[in-house]
Amino acid sequence: MNNKRYDRFYPGKVWLDTEGKRIQAHGGSIIYTNGKYYLYGENKEKTLPGSEVWHWGVRLYSSDDLYNWTDEGIIFKPSHDEKSPVHFSQYLDRPHIIFNEKTGKYVMWIKVMKKEKMCDQIIVVAVADNITDEFKMISAKTILGLSSGDFDLTVDAETKRAYIYFDKVHDYKTNCGDYTRQHTHIVCAPLNDDYTDVLGTYTEHLETRGGTYGREAPSFFERNGKKYLFTSATTGYFPNPTECAVCDTYDGEWKNIGTVHINDTENTSFRSQISSVFKHPFKKDLYIAVADRWLVNLPDNFPDNFYDILRSRDDPDRVQLMPNEEIDKIMECNKPCNRNTSIADYVYLPIEFDGDKPVIKWHGEWKIEDYE
């Protein structure tokens, strides 16, 4: 048993549960329900370099204070059937859970990239009566005829209509004849009344040229009537700058308002990627950016402008800022055979606001109790 009781957040440091084990809730989200906080995410405990294991299901933790987490077990189990879309070798990422007041069900959506062809990305939907129950898969399919990438879910507090935001993914054939993924839009689509499928309509937003200019990993939140989306660039597990877009409606004209990690000299979102935003239910204006530090072994001399260096290689209209061999050397830790995501850390930081613009500053440690 871990006798240490946390009384604050330590972003980027090893975070243990109440049994003294690393917390395994990557690509995670927090939900407050039934008088408790619940943290859930990808269980990466078996995802070691050289293994065929991408995920070991979705793990859930409970807490009374957001600092100390008790393991509630695996609520969505991996399959051992190689034909299953949720076989442990399939690229299952970023689960999101919403509660349906009408049906009384908790509904989990999960993105799955098929390992045979990563451009083929589907959505798995599973349901449970209680958040601590095992979620049962009810569908696994392409939605809206699109290959859907990272996503987020939200429920309108008044109408109870739910929406999904996801990055639209395309096949792209390179000059070498290989196929790669291009992320060109963020899609918004309303869900049906029981939150188990889309209605069939959608809108496209925040168009990009793709490549490292593409945006993924949308994280949605609301404040003072405005809707916000944090998005990440498409550099794999390699960290890059988070951008923010704002809109007055769910499917209106989204406007990019720039990067948010304002004192981040490396331009890497403090070496992390945001997976969700949690509004504290008992604080006036406390929003928490929930993020993973996927690569814990980046070099100390990591170039401050490395994202621009990557983009210069991706853009034929720009002068390349670093030779390919030097770029490849830095990117070595991002190769699948070298990634050990079982030891990925977490970077949970408070979101501040400059007027209506969200900003995130670095805190080596911080406490919820310091906020009204």
Where are these regions (language model features)?
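Carbohydrate-active catalytic/glycan-binding domains of CAZyme proteins
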Residues: 1-372
